[in-house]
Amino acid sequence: MHFTIQREALLKPLQLVAGVVERRQTLPVLSNVLLVVEGQQLSLTGTDLEVELVGRVVLEDAAEPGEITVPARKLMDICKSLPNDVLIDIRVEEQKLLVKAGRSRFTLSTLPANDFPTVEEGPGSLNFSIAQSKLRRLIDRTSFAMAQQDVRYYLNGMLLEVNGGTLRSVATDGHRLAMCSLDAQIPSQDRHQVIVPRKGILELARLLTEQDGEVGIVLGQHHIRATTGEFTFTSKLVDGKFPDYERVLPRGGDKLVVGDRQQLREAFSRTAILSNEKYRGIRLQLSNGLLKIQANNPEQEEAEEEVQVEYNGGNLEIGFNVSYLLDVLGVIGTEQVRFILSDSNSSALVHEADNDDSAYVVMPMRL
């Protein structure tokens, strides 16, 4: 195997692929990246057995075909440390990878390509194409609500659902829920649901960088695959049943609060400073046109903010985890935000003021 490549052309896919590779691995080959040269194309593959990413680069000069695996992090660090527009020469000699650039020479250990595991694929049961920016929006709007290391393993990921042409993302950790939908013109009669694990979602989001580009999605029985011109991403799915999110959405809330998102965000952030560090509870007191936000902590310290809001329901007092409210206000894009409440024991439903494609549910706290 032998090829030459510009530093930038190699570094971009190498950084993406190395992101999938975990530093501490049970199998040494999983710390490696698989390099394959075929014709005028170099492909780089990284995997942790859950998630697999293949990056592709077109080689400008003639290349000798071959395949080998080398330590991903070391190869990436070498590329990063080389000068910007240098030409890198890479060849395999006597089971070592020789990397030459300018006056620099590196020799890396290798493992055979045959040792490199591939993520098994079954047949795809649903294929569709969608703008990268749209899929990125679905992920960005909801990924913060995914659980981390929850024993209910099906919450450590995101539900992607195709139903009647609509693509929807849903994430919940049991305390709050985030949901975003968009019309994707996907020709699917049946409701189709998959749970993509947390790492898969976060890696996929990193790849969706082109504003105008499309991404092809294949949903299978056990895998999701996403393909663009430059990469192919595969992730195993979480085998489990996602909660019925529609039952979680509060119905019949009769108290509507409309406020300035940035004002509320700043007021919540300031109040949070003196909330209980462990439970993060704040108290909201609503009266005509006014929201009073209060927090206190075991040291008997107190914070209080008053924010003008549109509200004409009766007086209401309700407690929330301030971190959950700040997370929601952090992803909402409009200037105004709507809270729909019913009583002090019921969850809040949060929307953008003039847009219903996203919905957020936050459970109340007893204070």
UniProtKB/Swiss-Prot annotation:
SUPFAM superfamilies: DNA clamp. The keyword Cell membrane does not apply. The keyword Cytoplasm applies. Keywords: Cytoplasm, DNA replication, DNA-binding, DNA-directed DNA polymerase, Nucleotidyltransferase, Transferase. It is found in: Cytoplasm. Pfam families: DNA_pol3_beta (PF00712), DNA_pol3_beta_2 (PF02767), DNA_pol3_beta_3 (PF02768). One of its GO terms (biological process) is DNA strand elongation involved in DNA replication. Transmembrane segments: none annotated. InterPro entries: DNA_clamp_sf, DNA_polIII_beta, DNA_polIII_beta_C, DNA_polIII_beta_cen, DNA_polIII_beta_N. GO terms for molecular function: 3'-5' exonuclease activity; DNA binding; DNA-directed DNA polymerase activity. One of its GO terms (cellular component) is cytoplasm. Forms a ring-shaped head-to-tail homodimer around DNA which binds and tethers DNA polymerases and other proteins to the DNA. The DNA replisome complex has a single clamp-loading complex (3 tau and 1 each of delta, delta', psi and chi subunits) which binds 3 Pol III cores (1 core on the leading strand and 2 on the lagging strand) each with a beta sliding clamp dimer. Additional proteins in the replisome are other copies of gamma, psi and chi, Ssb, DNA helicase and RNA primase. Confers DNA tethering and processivity to DNA polymerases and other proteins. Acts as a clamp, forming a ring around DNA (a reaction catalyzed by the clamp-loading complex) which diffuses in an ATP-independent manner freely and bidirectionally along dsDNA. Initially characterized for its ability to contact the catalytic subunit of DNA polymerase III (Pol III), a complex, multichain enzyme responsible for most of the replicative synthesis in bacteria; Pol III exhibits 3'-5' exonuclease proofreading activity. Belongs to the beta sliding clamp family. This is Beta sliding clamp. The gene is dnaN.
